[in-house]
Amino acid sequence: LWLGPRGGYTAATPRFAKKIEKGGNGYLNSDSMDICVGSEKYLQNLEKFLTDTCTEFDIQYLKLDGFCLKPCTNPKHDHITGGENDMYFVTEMWQRWIDLFTRLRESRAKDNKPLWINMTCYVNPSPWWLQYVNSVWLQNSMDIGFAKNLEQQAQVDAEITYRDSMYYDFMCTRALQFPAKNIYNHEPIYGNTAKVEYTDEEFEKFLFWNACRGQAFNELYLSYNKMNSAKWRILARMLRWQKANHHILKNAMLLGGDPAENNIYAYAAWTKAGEGIIALRNPTDEKTDLTLTLNKLMGCPENLRAVKCYNVYNTTGADSLDLFSYGDKMQITLAPFEMKIFQFGDRDNRCLAPENTNDFTLSFT
């Protein structure tokens, strides 16, 4: 269920908020011209709606999209106001939301049902929230964007660079201590309104790179008319690999420089048992030679001994027959805009063999 607590992001938002108030179900926040998301009666009504709806339709995912744009300062509403930076309102508002989340989870738990809660806009991306929700939006990026670091680059490379530059801002510049697995990043987007066109090869590159960022779930913003048989199979293969290796990918960390400043960078993820995934990318139009050292700077455990290296995505190289241990070095060349994804371990977990699948067509008349 995708629901906007503040009433959406359109010109209709103020009108919707006024209808909520007129119906006695909450209030208009005149400071931001949307629904007052700190109102006690609004949250009571919303909690009942969410609880009943999740139960009736067995909903296991809630995307709560848009919270408090501006604190409400109306003293006639059923919430407190005042304090430095309106913190009286903010504190009470979030406490009410915490109570809502808690009771909602308790309701689902009684039926032995899971519930994934995703908080999007106007939320501080603090790991503190992970006591109550499963994921939080990055907050610092557009739904989709394209980097301007180079004029002559494919659309897919500009999009990848843009999103990773926002990750760099989030993880490195702002140094927000937030686990990658709980980030909501809007990917993958391959829809009509996004105005993107990717070949099958570019689609594969886009999907597998996004998986290496480590997020635990994907919202598939895909327009069916833009998909073909090859793209559906690429998507299925990526999702199988991502799911099978989430125990590794969830530990992803961003290494290197800001890709929007034409820096080579990587995502590296390891387990204590020595399973690892390293994704390297060159966001520039120049060939780059580099030495990859398997040490603690790359997140490698010091007990790494004699593991194999498998190509998850590598269009210019064959699988290596060498065994790698802690401290070993790999000499790598990255062509312009090239990316490589290596998986380390005792066995091949790339999920290359397809599961039992059949081609089929759904027709609607």
Predicted regions and their residues:
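Active-site-adjacent "subsite" loops/lids of carbohydrate-active enzymes
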Residues: 1-57
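Hydrophobic faces of well-ordered beta-strands that scaffold small-molecule active sites
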Residues: 1-3, 62-64, 117-119, 217-218
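Active-site beta-loop-alpha junctions enriched in small/polar residues
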Residues: 2-8, 67-69, 120-124
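Short secondary-structure boundary/capping segments
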Residues: 16-18, 77-81, 132-140
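The substrate-binding groove and active-site-proximal loops of carbohydrate-active enzymes
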Residues: 28-47, 81-96, 194
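Active-site groove signature of glycoside hydrolases
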Residues: 47-79
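C-terminal beta-strand-rich structural cap/linker in extracellular carbohydrate-active enzymes
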Residues: 321-362
